[in-house]
């Protein structure tokens, strides 16, 4: 097959393994896992004051 | 004649006789949302929800013996195969997963790693896995034989299943399309509607096959421990 001739299977194997590793890296850094949220939200006392230095 | 039939899969995108077809494998890398920004965009949220659903599913499959982060490789495997399968449906984009080179590259090292790890570190466990639960004592020799053979052909089946599914759909579409120029106008419109339906089926098959590949490798890895 003509497209298999210039590059051998070994280099294709290395290229695809590196592609897999690249995909893994992209997915690892782009996932934002959800941390479990607490059911009871503790709302601390807030006094609303006018802003001043 | 057989090489002629499959010669539709020989891509013609070559610059200076250097075939750049395999560069379509990297297309998925451009589509995965990059993590440069703090606030997630809509694409981020969508991709994240897909990955989290898969993560929960694989974690269930791996059972209590799965360590933290053990689903990660299977989720990224799913994303690689999904993008390659799906992009191949668009015109002029090479389907890299329809070639045994890519599928064997993915399947063989995974299976080999699981087998080597299992047989070297948990030899007793691997031997007990050769006999499924609840087999009568009479059938045990045959079950060992069958399970050994099924174990050995696993990388082959993983690779060939994916490649054959991808090739079959494309081949069907190509064969239907090749008859187009010799038909009348009415039949050509029916042919086009049929081809569009096949394309929808092919997109479903692309997603399903990538899922099957990932799930099966999860199962194979969970058997080891």
Swiss-Prot record, chain A:
Domain of life: Eukaryota
Residue stretches spanning the membrane: 6-26
GO CC annotation, single: proton-transporting ATP synthase complex
Swiss-Prot/TrEMBL GO biological process terms: proton motive force-driven ATP synthesis
Topology class, membrane: Single-pass membrane protein
Keywords tagged on the record: ATP synthesis, CF(0), Hydrogen ion transport, Ion transport, Membrane, Mitochondrion, Transmembrane, Transmembrane helix, Transport
Annotated compartments: Mitochondrion membrane
InterPro entries: ATP8_metazoa
GO molecular function: proton transmembrane transporter activity
Entry keyword Acetylation: no
Function comment: Mitochondrial membrane ATP synthase (F(1)F(0) ATP synthase or Complex V) produces ATP from ADP in the presence of a proton gradient across the membrane which is generated by electron transport complexes of the respiratory chain. F-type ATPases consist of two structural domains, F(1) - containing the extramembraneous catalytic core and F(0) - containing the membrane proton channel, linked together by a central stalk and a peripheral stalk. During catalysis, ATP synthesis in the catalytic domain of F(1) is coupled via a rotary mechanism of the central stalk subunits to proton translocation.
Protein family (similarity comment): Belongs to the ATPase protein 8 family.
Oligomeric and partner information: F-type ATPases have 2 components, CF(1) - the catalytic core - and CF(0) - the membrane proton channel.
Protein name, entry field: ATP synthase protein 8
């Amino acid at each position: 097959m003509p497209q298999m001739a210039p590059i051998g299977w070994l280099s294709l194997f290395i290229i695809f393994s590196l592609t897999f590793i690249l995909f893994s890296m992209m997915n690892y850094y782009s996932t934002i896992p959800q941390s479990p949220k607490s059911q009871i939200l503790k709302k601390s006392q807030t006094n609303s004051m006018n802003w001043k230095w | 004649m057989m090489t002629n039939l499959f010669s539709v899969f020989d891509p013609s995108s070559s610059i200076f006789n250097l075939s750049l077809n395999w560069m379509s494998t990297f297309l998925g890398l451009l589509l995965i949302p990059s993590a440069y920004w703090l606030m997630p965009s809509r694409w981020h949220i969508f991709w994240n929800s897909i990955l989290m659903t898969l993560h929960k599913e694989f974690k269930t499959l791996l059972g209590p013996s799965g360590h933290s982060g053990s689903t990660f490789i299977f989720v990224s495997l799913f994303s690689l195969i999904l993008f390659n399968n799906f992009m191949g449906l668009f015109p002029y984009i090479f389907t890299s997963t329809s070639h045994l080179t890519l599928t064997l590259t993915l399947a063989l090292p995974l299976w080999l790693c699981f087998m080597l790890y299992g047989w070297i570190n948990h030899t007793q466990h691997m031997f007990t896995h050769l006999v499924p639960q609840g087999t009568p004592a009479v059938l045990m020799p045959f079950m060992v034989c069958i399970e050994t053979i099924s174990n050995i052909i696993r990388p082959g089946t993983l690779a060939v299943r994916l490649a054959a599914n991808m090739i079959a759909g494309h081949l069907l579409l190509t064969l239907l399309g090749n008859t187009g120029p010799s038909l009348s106008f009415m039949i050509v419109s029916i042919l086009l509607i049929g081809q569009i339906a096949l394309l929808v089926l092919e997109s479903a098959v692309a997603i399903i096959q990538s899922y099957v590949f990932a799930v099966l490798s999860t199962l194979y890895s969970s058997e080891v421990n």
